[in-house]
């Protein structure tokens, strides 16, 4: 047989096996998840009184964990720190309970080894980066049990963890929990010592709580009346898992419906032919699914009869539709629709992009998609917004793989575009279409840049997710420029997966990609996704059927790639990667045009053109090259800021070129008065359309737009105060530059400049007259807003909580300003002499008889050396700031914080590299570009202006 026949044969066998467990009389179900140390440890704790003695009921499970402790004292699981912590905590509790076991005299020593491991691991644990089910309840519960044995730990996030624990407890309605099934039954072991397990026997289903061995074990431990049903369930699971190793249990069993629905929906989504998969078997599955859906009145849970969830319900409804046993989505919508997204179930900590992607996919398969148009648009908006606001890839709370979210989001969003192309869903806006297109291309860009040399993206299941994503997004016309490379990548991924498909190796720890209390793998899922990835058509849909996306230029990405590809920083990057950045940049253009200007319409005139089309590339490419991509929203905020800086700076330059000292003194006073008034910028005065705005009105409008930015409102007063101060110093420094230029014109260029030293001038006036420093501090406020929004507290905190950190950040800003000033001067020498703008090489340190720089080449070389020095000082400063911030927020978060702030620095560094490339005035470089000498042609008669010539040298974000 060929590969296609083999794929269908594997799919057929998989579904027949699962269906047999579903319909065979007497079957208690099936589950192919790997056994877990965590759940096995809970079962090992179960004891009961027999003949007046306390006896452990499942001693064989304790023997298993006893024999599988690792050399460092831990039980590692998938190798992640959090799984090692949770596993080891549970096993340490079990060890302490079994310390009196005379047959294992080294238990105390093993317990000390586990304790030593935890003492170190808990100190390294970053709670804010943790995504495990109920970890904020489970870890405190286990720590409290250890307290009873005299074992305690101190660690940096101890108080934060217990505050989360107390907050969650305070929200629980115990009477409601005891009354009926809820998702909390899945993790009730976390409430040992809090919950009254005697009030829960009626919630048992087939001897278990939501198919969870750990909760069932906790119930047996704490209920005062022994329940034979629960004991029988645990014994049965141990028996089922005997082939996996001696006396273990998984995190979930049975998983019959979960495995059927997830496996079959994946096979359908990726074009497996149901006619080749035993149609009678599939029909029996459909009838059983419909039976349970009817019993649940249109919704169902992970296990029928338990808490309803949107994930299970949505996929079941979709399958019934494609298996010709349709059921209405009405009850599903009523149960799960929330104001801005669909919830998975009650009590969830946060919304899930994968759940909403599944809901969207399901509604798009309804017989009449337009009936649910408002819900479809709502979910699509939510999913697109998640991608819009996320840096890099989107991770989800149900799967550790960064590609799982990409797979489900791409399937749903591309099908949305397909349906829209058929004339459905007419209320979808052009803005949403644009955001969907950007989201999809973000996925493909990140995946292409992350493939490993062997063709994989991690384990086989993760590689399957990535390949399926590529197949879906390849349906978009936006991929045309990189389609050849895309197909090569897909072929290399298939070459990696095909031998694995035939070999069927046993699962390894790295295959545990599914998130529960610890991670786990599921054999049927690995098979289903592997078969799906090798079968999916490439592209999933004909690109001509995705016909309603806003058109984008097919030439601009090539121009951007060719122009910026000349820079040393980009030369090593392959052509496809530079083109990918070009496509991302081109997609951002309409988004920038949609944002209202932060300046006056009259001020904006003449400020548009090719330069603004180049701007997104200058933000996307450097960040991506460093492996620190920012969110689309963050990039847009930066671009809007640059546009506002450019327009404001341009207007002031052009209108102040003939200003007298008296004019400048008057404007300085107005600026100081404006920023000294605490009421300033709380409201904005209207300016009649029939006159040009005054200088102070332009400055006020610009400052107002930043200080009242909607994504900076939750920044602390200290951080916003720093932004306010930076804006004031920038405009005052601009006036000081104008005053210097007046003196320069009066004195003449041939006279030696007397006064402030070059060092002091570049570090005070020169650095302050750099718009990029405003951008850095504005990014600080955006970050502060994000931090305080996540905290959900009215007590707003500073991004940098200590005087040392604040000083270090301001030092980075100063070095950045000085670097920008020097770089601007280095690349503007000819322009500044022609226009009589003060430049670094006009200072006596460069022109004096003993300066050692008596030639233009020597002066430029000296200035280049200083520019390199300050650029390195900026890099070193940011790196040191990361190190000092790490103890406060954790290593990953510290790095993420600084990456957000550094975006504008990378943008300016690119300008510096452009200047070094041309070694001439940037405006001359732009003239070359417009003539086509650098391989970039004119488009529609407009030149590709890369910067502007100004009176005082403040060229937008670069300066």
Swiss-Prot record:
The active site is at 311 (for class ii diterpene cyclase activity), 649 (for class i diterpene synthase activity). Bifunctional premutilin synthase; part of the gene cluster that mediates the biosynthesis of pleuromutilin, a tricyclic diterpene showing antibacterial properties. The geranylgeranyl diphosphate (GGPP) synthase catalyzes the first step in pleuromutilin biosynthesis. GGPP is then substrate of the premutilin synthase (PS) to yield premutilin. Premutilin synthase is a bifunctional enzyme composed of the fusion of a class II diterpene cyclase (DTC) and a class I diterpene synthase (DTS), with the corresponding domains and active sites containing characteristic aspartate-rich motifs. Belongs to the terpene synthase family. The gene is PS. The keyword Isomerase applies. Its EC number is 5.5.1.-, 4.2.3.-. InterPro entries: Terpene_synthase-like (IPR050148), Terpenoid_cyclase/PrenylTrfase (IPR008930). Binds 3 Mg(2+) ions per subunit. A motif (DXDD motif) lies at residues 309-312. Mg(2+) 2 binds at residues 649, 653. Pathway: Secondary metabolite biosynthesis; terpenoid biosynthesis. Induction: Expression is up-regulated during pleuromutilin production. A motif (DDXXD motif) lies at residues 649-653. GO terms for biological process: antibiotic biosynthetic process; diterpenoid biosynthetic process. The class II DTC active site contains a DXDD motif from which the middle Asp acts as the catalytic acid in this protonation-initiated cyclization reaction, while the class I DTS active site contains a DDXXD motif that binds divalent magnesium cofactors required for the catalyzed allylic diphosphate ester ionization-initiated reaction, with the first Asp playing a particularly key role. This is Bifunctional premutilin synthase. Residues 543-959 are annotated as: Class I diterpene synthase. Residues 940-959 have a biased composition (Polar residues). Mg(2+) 1 binds at residues 649, 653.
